[in-house]
Amino acid sequence: MKTFTATPETVTRDWFVVDADGKTLGRIATEIATRLRGKHKPEYTPHVDTGDYIIVVNAEKVTVTGNKAKGKTYYSHSGFPGGIKQISFEKLQAQKPEMIIEKAVKGMLPKGPLGRAMFRKLKVYAGAEHNHTAQQPQVLDI
């Protein structure tokens, strides 16, 4: 029997909605990254994007354990000398709560064109509302 290899034409993608209210950041991010890659499907193929679409709501209510809310720092650099910027978890959660989940999931995906295609299937919203009701997403309980 030949080994099955998925092709982009044969892949079926579902839409799932995840509620991040009260969930731990790392635990929710690993499950989202696995679903975006498609590793939960039997037809998973490493060089083909077989993952599903994931909608995350209530990103502002995601939690971290221990003292990470005060101690966790996110860095970015402009590329110019002295252009490093840092922001704590608490401040980032107040300013751009979507970025916390996006950054955690992006680090768990492959680097390169395939990883960027997988990351584009992630939709994160700070509040409880999203504008993807036409896709009829299923609730994914993590």
Curated annotation (Swiss-Prot):
Signal peptide: none annotated. Pfam families: Ribosomal_L13 (PF00572). Keywords: Ribonucleoprotein, Ribosomal protein. It comes from the Bacteria. GO terms for biological process: negative regulation of translation; translation. Gene3D superfamilies: Ribosomal protein L13 (3.90.1180.10). InterPro entries: Ribosomal_uL13, Ribosomal_uL13_bac-type, Ribosomal_uL13_CS, Ribosomal_uL13_sf. GO terms for cellular component: cytosolic large ribosomal subunit. One of its GO terms (molecular function) is structural constituent of ribosome. Belongs to the universal ribosomal protein uL13 family. NCBIfam families: rplM_bact (TIGR01066). Part of the 50S ribosomal subunit. PANTHER family: LARGE RIBOSOMAL SUBUNIT PROTEIN UL13M (PTHR11545:SF2), RIBOSOMAL PROTEIN L13 (PTHR11545). This protein is one of the early assembly proteins of the 50S ribosomal subunit, although it is not seen to bind rRNA by itself. It is important during the early stages of 50S assembly. This is Large ribosomal subunit protein uL13. It comes from Shewanella baltica (strain OS155 / ATCC BAA-1091).
